[in-house]
């Protein structure tokens, strides 16, 4: 760049700094411009690895969607527990009025320090979220769910009144306000969303998410969570096998997936994941029904191996450390890249 243009650029940058504050425009190579992405764990080791950065990124909008009872709220409660364990403050905006405090406590959530709001309208919920973000004192906010963010006009209207596009407009306006503040305060905002079926779709997926298209664009990470099977003990169903696809990721390569077990009353079983991922990486040996680690048998069947690791936390920590090291060396081995899924919406 010639000297005259360089001076003109310096003058412009100086004027921008004066008017909008220092750091309004930066060179990407500047030391302060590039920050390591801070994350909160999802509670699933496999999903943390599939996300590419070790968890859900702070300073971003994340959308978690899926059918009913697929584990959406469980995933967010694990993230809240992770945030609180790191000394952070978390808030849960319960638009569905369905949070189970007992279950949250079992997942490691500190209920005494969890901020909770049960708003009457969608506008109130999103305004509360915006105020918490702008405070800069809250590290993680969960909004459960987009489908329950009912516009005030709809609540005050009569049954059967048409309110086409109201919720989509509400979400679009709120996200325009929220995103800049979220980035500035480094707050992680998670929206839980439900799935609906589009009528008259002949080709492609008929599934779509509620609340219009704004959230699809503003979300840095979108997770599609599905129940893929039941976990049985004798004849009793004690949990679900769950698969999560990373359908959008602006902080790492997308389209990876992870599978894990969710046990009723217990949440995501990290120990079951250690056994499965350990076998995948040849860290845990499997011979028939027996699992072994470094030549020592740790259990016959996954349940017994899981129980053994529960009783020997130092061994579990060692296996986890080796899995993380192996995943760093083989980024696609832990969760195979899948074909790009049909776009939802």
Swiss-Prot record:
GO biological process per UniProt:
DNA recombination; DNA repair; SOS response
Primary location group: cytoplasm
> Where, in this chain's numbering, is ATP bound?
66-73
Location in the cell: Cytoplasm
Q: Is DNA damage tagged as a keyword? A: yes
> Which HAMAP family does UniProt cross-reference here?
RecA (MF_00268)
Give the UniProt family note. Belongs to the RecA family.
Q: What protein name is recorded for this chain?
A: Protein RecA
Give the species: Acidithiobacillus ferrooxidans (strain ATCC 23270 / DSM 14882 / CIP 104768 / NCIMB 8455) (Ferrobacillus ferrooxidans (strain ATCC 23270))
Query: Highest lineage ranks of the organism?
Result: Bacteria, Pseudomonadati, Pseudomonadota, Acidithiobacillia, Acidithiobacillales
